[in-house]
Amino acid sequence: MNKMNAAVLTEYKKIDWKSVDIPKISENEVLIKVGYACICGSDQHIFLGEFHPRTSLPLIQGHEFAGKIVAIGPKVKNYKVGDRVAVDPIIWCGKCPACRRHHYPACTTLKLVGVDLDGGFSEYMKVPE
């Protein structure tokens, strides 16, 4: 099985239900089978084309979701297959000056799940540990 269903924002104001590849995880990522996903106000703004200049289409939205880990990369230490998780949608590097001061929202390479990266309006989602 290497395909999944996802709600893909193909153009602003248009979402298509598509069969897409299940994300492949890297050594420090986990694969989550999404169990629950919520629609947030920012999802609505992205749908309408009003929200974020970094968003590019096509995009799988959804930054508020939870599920169960079904696969882990070989360097993942804090999670195991079967763990139930809710995802922090902010992905920071942990290495830049802002991150070293624990000011993660100012990370120089900050990415937001469902905004910069595909999100949880899908059957599976990958995120870094």
What is the predicted role of each segment?
Residues 2-5:
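Extreme N-terminal starter segment of soluble prokaryotic enzymes
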Residues 13-17, 41-42:
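Short N-terminal binding/cap micro-motifs at the start of the first secondary-structure element
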Residues 42-48:
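Cytochrome P450 core scaffold surrounding the K-helix E-X-X-R motif
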Residues 44, 89, 111:
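Short secondary-structure boundary segments
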Residues 93-129:
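NAD(P)H dinucleotide-binding glycine-rich loop of Rossmann-like/cofactor-binding domains
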